[in-house]
């Protein structure tokens, strides 16, 4: 009798432990898998699966999966200016925002005022590495 009760109790515990909040988990996974641009204090990361990650550094350098891409002075200046604009928007978002964080709590949606863009519209023509990342650039997030 004790063995039957013990096995029944273990089966109930396993069933309860396996039943998590699937909706919350699904929302979390969907948010994480979206293409996005994360603006941190030292770097802007552009992520879009299955493409490699792009990192923009404060001095305007561009890295693709940790490999630095050679840029001319005009391209580097454009990325440096965009980095500064994104840092200003990040600070404004972090100090003023009451927006909900994403599912992990790491990032907030970046508030870009109407009529302003951190990157020029011809970014993909001027720097070909950005051609496949327009969806990610349209989803800016501020890292906490």
Go through the PLM ranges and name each one:
Residues 1-19:
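Sec-dependent bacterial lipoprotein signal peptides
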Residues 19-144:
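Terminal leader/tail segments of proteins
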């Amino acid at each position: 009798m004790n063995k039957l009760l013990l096995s029944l109790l273990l089966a109930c515990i396993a069933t309860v432990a396996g039943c998590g909040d699937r909706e919350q988990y699904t929302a979390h996974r969907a948010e994480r898998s979206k293409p996005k641009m994360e603006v941190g204090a030292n770097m802007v990361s552009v992520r879009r699966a299955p493409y490699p990650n792009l990192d923009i550094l404060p001095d305007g350098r561009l890295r693709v999966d940790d490999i630095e891409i050679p840029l001319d002075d005009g391209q580097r200046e454009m990325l440096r200016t965009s980095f500064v604009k994104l840092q200003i928007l990040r600070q404004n978002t972090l100090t003023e925002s009451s927006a909900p964080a994403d599912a992990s709590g790491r990032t907030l949606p970046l508030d870009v005022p109407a009529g302003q863009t951190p990157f020029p519209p011809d970014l993909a023509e001027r720097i070909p590495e950005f051609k496949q990342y327009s969806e990610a650039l349209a989803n800016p997030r501020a890292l906490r």
